[in-house]
C-alpha cells in the first residue's frame, strides 16, 4: 500500500479511501454455465416477487401484474448483470435472458392461488449468524436457529420462496430448480436426496413459525 501511495497516489485514494476495485475481466462466454444460468433465473424470481410485495402481493397478483413485474426485473438484470458477472455477447445475452424470463414466468404462475392476505418472501434465511439486523418485515429473524428434530444438529440455509397466509396457519415453501424435469416428477418424494432440501425448508418453517 505504501508503494502504491508513492507510485500512484490517485490509485491509492481509489483503493483505500473510496474502496474501489476493478471488476475482474473474464473471457466473454458464448453461454452461461448451468450454475450461472440457475442463478440468473433465481435473480429474476427474487426481484419479481419482491417487487410485488407487499402491494398487490405476489399471491394476489394477476398474471398481467406478474408479467409486468418480471419485465421490469428482466430489464434491470439485463443492464446490471454484465457489470458484475460475465455475460455472453449482446445478441446471445438477449436470447439467454428471454429464455430465463420464460422459465421464471412458468415458475411464478405454476402454483395455485393462496388465501387473501398471503405474504411472500424470497431468499429467506435461517440459522444465518450475524443477520439479526436484517429481520425487518420478515416472518422470523434470519439468525434464528433451526435444528434437526430430536438432535442438536443445526441446519442453515435460504428458502427460495415462502408464502404465509394472513392467519399464519397456511405455509407453502418453494424450491426452484432449473435443470431437466425428472420423469414422473409427481411421484418423487425424496428423489434419492435431491428433494431433501424441501424437507429442510419445511423443518425450518415448522420450528420458526408460531
Description of each model-found segment:
Residues 1-47:
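C-terminal, charged and often intrinsically disordered regions of DNA end-processing helicases
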Residues 43-137:
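A non-catalytic, helix-rich entry segment at domain boundaries
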Residues 10, 33, 37, 41, ...:
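Hydrophobic (often cysteine-bearing) scaffold residues that line and stabilize catalytic clefts
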Residues 124-208:
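Non-catalytic protein-protein interaction segments used by genome-maintenance enzymes to assemble
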Residues 1, 207-210:
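Short, intrinsically disordered, charge-balanced linker/junction segments flanking boundaries
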Residues 9-22, 74-80, 169-180:
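Active-site-adjacent bridging/hinge elements
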Amino acid at each position: 500500500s505504501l508503494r502504491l501511495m508513492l507510485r500512484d497516489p490517485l490509485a491509492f485514494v481509489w483503493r483505500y479511501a473510496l474502496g474501489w476495485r476493478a471488476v475482474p475481466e473474464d473471457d466473454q462466454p458464448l453461454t452461461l454455465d448451468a450454475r450461472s444460468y440457475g442463478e440468473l433465473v433465481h435473480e429474476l424470481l427474487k426481484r419479481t416477487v419482491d417487487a410485488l410485495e407487499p402491494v398487490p402481493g405476489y399471491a394476489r397478483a394477476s398474471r398481467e401484474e406478474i408479467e409486468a413485474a418480471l419485465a421490469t426485473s428482466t430489464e434491470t438484470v439485463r443492464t446490471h448483470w454484465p457489470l458484475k458477472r460475465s455475460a455472453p455477447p449482446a445478441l446471445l445475452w438477449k436470447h439467454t435472458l428471454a429464455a430465463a424470463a420464460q422459465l421464471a414466468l412458468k415458475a411464478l404462475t405454476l402454483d395455485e392461488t393462496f388465501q387473501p392476505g398471503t405474504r411472500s418472501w424470497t431468499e429467506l434465511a435461517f440459522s444465518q449468524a450475524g443477520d439479526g439486523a436484517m429481520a425487518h418485515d420478515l416472518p422470523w429473524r434470519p439468525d434464528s436457529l433451526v435444528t434437526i428434530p430430536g438432535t442438536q444438529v443445526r441446519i442453515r440455509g435460504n428458502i427460495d420462496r415462502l408464502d404465509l397466509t394472513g392467519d399464519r396457519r397456511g405455509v407453502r415453501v418453494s424450491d426452484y430448480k432449473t435443470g431437466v424435469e425428472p420423469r414422473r416428477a409427481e411421484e418423487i418424494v425424496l428423489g434419492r436426496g435431491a428433494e431433501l432440501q424441501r424437507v429442510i425448508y419445511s423443518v425450518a418453517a415448522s420450528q420458526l413459525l408460531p
